[in-house]
Amino acid sequence: MAIDFSKYIASVKDFPNKGIVFRDITPILQDGELYRIATHELAEYAKSRKADVIVGPEARGFIVGCPVATELGLGFVPARKPHKLPREVERASYDLEYGSNSLEMHKDAIKPGQRVVLCDDLMATAGTLRASKELIENLGGKLVGAAFYIELPDLKGREKLPDVDIYSLVQYHGA
């Protein structure tokens, strides 16, 4: 039975800034069975892409990616905000739909040739995905797919990274 996950995603207007509609996944996370099913859907996608490792950007990418990695018996690599990792890092900057930031990964986090699937809660402008892809490739890995709970197609993230296979549970048009 297919689940319409959009029924369990809260839409919060003017958060974190006026004019933004924030898509809140916490109702899914609060329901153990829904969370398990959403995790399984993303894990099946990662399995189909023959992933060797899962990457999740801070912070909600940890919530989405860690259980996917666990279900598949794969390692998980966090892409962290600056100055959170204790060892030598690779860094890439990106723009968000409402700001800018950087991501870092330990230089030894991805092995050369590893097939990587990124998991996160939402793809909007693809800024986080683009920065993560840069990090993965700089470390010698290959981004073979990206899986999201939510995609905002009107922000044209797919168009910005046409070489990346993208999977999402829910798409919100006109958002």
From Swiss-Prot:
Matching CDD domains: PRTases_typeI
UniProt superkingdom: Bacteria
SUPFAM superfamilies tied to this protein: PRTase-like
Cytoplasm listed as a keyword: yes
Catalytically driven reaction(s): AMP + diphosphate = 5-phospho-alpha-D-ribose 1-diphosphate + adenine
Principal subcellular localization: cytoplasm
Pfam families cross-referenced by the UniProt entry: Pribosyltran (PF00156)
Protein name, entry field: Adenine phosphoribosyltransferase
GO terms under biological process: adenine salvage; AMP salvage; purine ribonucleoside salvage
Pathway membership, UniProt: Purine metabolism; AMP biosynthesis via salvage pathway; AMP from adenine: step 1/1
Function as written in the Swiss-Prot or TrEMBL entry: Catalyzes a salvage reaction resulting in the formation of AMP, that is energically less costly than de novo synthesis.
GO cellular component, one term: cytoplasm
E.C. number: 2.4.2.7
InterPro entries: Ade_phspho_trans, PRibTrfase_dom, PRTase-like, UPRTase/APRTase
Family: Belongs to the purine/pyrimidine phosphoribosyltransferase family.
HAMAP family documented for this protein: Aden_phosphoribosyltr
Subunit and interaction comment: Homodimer.
